[in-house]
Regions:
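Mid/C-terminal beta-alpha module of Rossmann-like enzyme folds, strongest
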Residues: 210, 217-261
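Rossmann-fold cofactor-recognition segment
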Residues: 42-53
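Catalytic helix-loop patch of NAD(P)-dependent Rossmann-fold dehydrogenases
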Residues: 91, 95-96, 119-161, 165-167
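SDR active-site strand-loop-helix element
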Residues: 10, 33, 69-73, 111-117, ...
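NAD(P)H-binding glycine-rich loop region in Rossmannoid oxidoreductase-like domains
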Residues: 51-92
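NAD(P)-dependent short-chain dehydrogenase/reductase
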Residues: 149-199, 206, 212-213
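N-terminal Rossmann NAD(P)H-binding glycine-rich loop of SDR-like oxidoreductase domains
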Residues: 4-26
Length: 298
């Protein structure tokens, strides 16, 4: 009989989920979930499940009995959230989160919830702390914040991670802007990038590693800013990538949020991560992380 902690991962085929599968398997007994896309889940103990089906979800808890649940499943693309019926986004991002919290309480499991930096106002200054004003301006961000609230209303055995812009190279259907930028630059295509939108980006595999470290430290109930330590614009991130990967910086085109009037004008949700660092977490610089990504790519 295994004495390893049992970890249930939702969204195992998603952008972060694929890295959590690789990072946590072997160190823990994992069960990773997927729905429409398998991703890399077929390489691990996994199950296809519609997480909005409460009966199936309850059966999964009954059979697997997790010690920790990492809830990474969501309608996580703000643009995708706009294109879907609001009721569907709410069901996945809010109702499912509440159901998971209730099941975690029932089975005495800890819940790690991947929220977003986009819950912050975006106009209150830079390097925001966890108690900064919360003003989500998109349906996606609003439902992620509602997810936080639902969890807190259910129980207090949780860790909420307000996740920054994640970047890296995906091996599944779930891609990201950084990967698209790299491929365009590699092909000699110009890439328009915001000069006036600031985040604290975090590499995907660093995110998975940090979650692993937090689990090992037996985390207590908290809400944490979950990002890198550097505040950069999208354009500056592109410049770092070009510098590390010897790509043509002249292909980077400066654009402003003002150039796209229909785009949510979220100017600055860069986050202060002192609280995260207080766990003894080592955060790599963006240049260090990208250097490792490019090295592995070759």
């Amino acid at each position: 009989m295994s004495s390893l902690l049992k970890i249930l991962i939702t969204g195992g085929s998603g952008l972060l989920g694929q890295f959590l599968n690789k990072e946590l398997d072997g160190c823990f007994e994992i069960c990773t979930t997927f729905n429409a896309h398998k991703g890399n889940c077929d390489k691990f103990n996994s199950i296809k499940i519609d997480l909005t089906n409460l009966e199936l979800l309850a059966q999964l808890f009954q059979s697997f009995r997790p010690n920790i649940v990492i809830h990474a499943a969501a309608v996580s693309n703000p643009n995708a959230a706009i294109s879907l019926p609001a009721k569907e986004v709410f069901a996945i991002n809010v109702k499912t989160t509440e159901s998971l919290a209730k099941l975690c309480e029932k089975y005495s499991a800890k819940l790690i919830y991947l929220s977003t930096d986009l819950v912050y106002a975006g106009y209150r200054g830079s390097m925001l702390s966890e108690d900064a004003k919360l003003v989500p301006v998109s349906l996606y961000a609003e439902t992620k914040l509602l997810g936080e609230i639902k969890i807190k209303n259910v129980f207090d055995n949780y860790l909420i991670l307000r996740t920054a812009l994640l970047y890296g190279f995906s091996s599944t259907h779930a891609t990201n802007h950084f990967q698209e930028m790299y491929e365009k630059l590699l092909g000699g295509t110009a890439v328009p990038l915001f000069i006036d939108q600031y985040r604290t980006p975090l590499a995907l595999r660093d995110a998975a590693r940090i979650i692993h470290e937090i689990i090992q430290k037996d985390f207590k109930t908290a809400t944490l800013n979950f990002g890198g330590k550097e505040r950069v614009s999208r354009f500056e991130l592109g410049e770092i990538l070009c510098g590390v990967a010897s790509l043509n910086k002249n292909l980077l085109q400066k654009i402003s949020l003002n150039d796209l009037p229909n785009y949510p004008a979220i100017a600055d949700v860069s986050m202060n991560t002192d609280k995260l660092q207080s766990y003894g977490i080592n955060q790599q610089s963006i240049e260090e992380s990208i250097s490792l990504l490019i090295k592995d790519k070759k």
